[in-house]
Amino acid sequence: STGAGDDTISVTQGTLLAVTGVQSSIITGGTGADTITSVHINAASGLTASFNFAAGDSIVTGYDKITGYDLATASLFSDKLDFSGTAAVGTLATQNDFGTITSSNVATAGIATFDDAAGFATALIVNSTNLADVVGYLNANTAVEDTMAFLFDSTGNGVADSTMVYHNETGATDTIVLLSGQTGVNTLITANAHTAADAFIL
């Protein structure tokens, strides 16, 4: 755990054991735009890495970047993103405009794409230029504790290279976290399981 500021955190572990009821590592960056690198192999059950976020820790103007976030496989658990409150998988049941974002689509649980057309047709590339509008749109169309993920172009070259995870907080500022280099998230889940490409949120 660290305090305020833009911290760099590196954690290297081996293959984690199937021990229940505990976490192998709990990483809390605190406020600021933290850069977190984690190297490990999760267990089939029990031990995983947990990345913890309080409201205000990782926001649109300064968000955390995680390299080495492991998704679930057919035999291994996913790492955990532990937000304040109890995370739920969002659905985007409404489509209230915000900035340039006027429509959205959710093809699998918790995974969203966005368009600047009134009727969703083509998914926009989300990058630093339109990120604030996407976060505003998610805030306008999700409930408190709802969590969504979407592909993100972190370099501005027009190609999505990472995944951003959004959590609707009770206060005015919502949480977003970048899973750097991770583009294969299939669904968000609230109970860890052996399902390929799922990301565990809590």
Predicted regions and their residues:
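Acidic, glycine-rich calcium-binding repeat modules characteristic of RTX/beta-roll
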Residues: 1-108
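Low-complexity acidic/polar repeat-biased segments
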Residues: 77-79, 107-202
